[in-house]
């Protein structure tokens, strides 16, 4: 989603609150809870929940391994739910031609650098760079090349844009910023 006027362009960035993250966190939570319940049932020698039969599972080594997988899965699920709660990675890119400033804001993990705020002058922007890697794990990323700072990604690497969409976005942004486009 973006908002544009003659001199200002604001590009809103979706963070970790995506449908796929909700689905993975929920599936991982339920699966790891099931593993932990089966491991606990094999330790106790009786069914904690009748949905998960544990008579055939011996506690050593299968029950221990299932309990370990269940605990590890719960930790990973907790991590995913925390990133969703904190909306890590969300923010905005603001390009202001009137002031000649580019502002990039992202939410990070809680702590010292929770708010990530970058500010550049437009005159320091060298180019808009497109990096396309085709194949099994295709990757299309849009970068802003800053003099003395290197390349800053403007689009998340896990967003599945087509090559045409990336090129269109790069062309519009390069036209707005009045900088060239580089393709790698």
UniProtKB/Swiss-Prot annotation:
Main location: plastid
Signal peptide: none
InterPro entries in UniProt: PSI_Ycf4_assembly
Record's bilayer topology term: Multi-pass membrane protein
Entry keyword set: Chloroplast, Membrane, Photosynthesis, Plastid, Thylakoid, Transmembrane, Transmembrane helix
GO molecular function annotation: mRNA binding; unfolded protein binding
Pfam families: Ycf4 (PF02392)
Cellular component aspect of the GO annotation: chloroplast; chloroplast thylakoid membrane; photosystem I
Compartments, as annotated in UniProt: Plastid, Chloroplast thylakoid membrane
Transmembrane segments: 21-43, 58-80
Protein's GO biological process: photosystem I assembly
Functional summary from the UniProt entry: Seems to be required for the assembly of the photosystem I complex.
Entry similarity comment: Belongs to the Ycf4 family.
The protein, known as: Photosystem I assembly protein Ycf4
